[in-house]
Amino acid sequence: MALSEIDKQLLKRCLDREPRAWEDFVDRFVGLVIHVVNHTGNSRSIQISEQDREDFTAEVFLAILADEFAVLKRFRGASSISTYLTVIARRVVVRELLKRKISAM
């Protein structure tokens, strides 16, 4: 799927560190990230508390911010940005769930 013009401009604004770009990015994709957090927990029969949901969502956005937006810089447009972020979010949530499982042992 081709990258929409809106998403293309939003990515460019984030990478150029334009004012309000990050806030617009979060506003656009926070619903998707929360959905992925919930779905990832449900698919593993794990009840995710509201606090965990907020923590996991924050971890996803921190992962995107890490290393000067390295995750966004690696996006090549082979899929929609939503599909790409879904994969990123799922990986972050699974990693966080595993960390919590290990620390609970």
Identify the function of each model-found stretch:
Residues 4-9:
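Acidic, Ser/Thr- and Pro/Gly-rich low-complexity regulatory segments
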Residues 25, 29-33, 56, 60, ...:
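Residue-level preference for hydrophobic side chains embedded in well-ordered alpha helices
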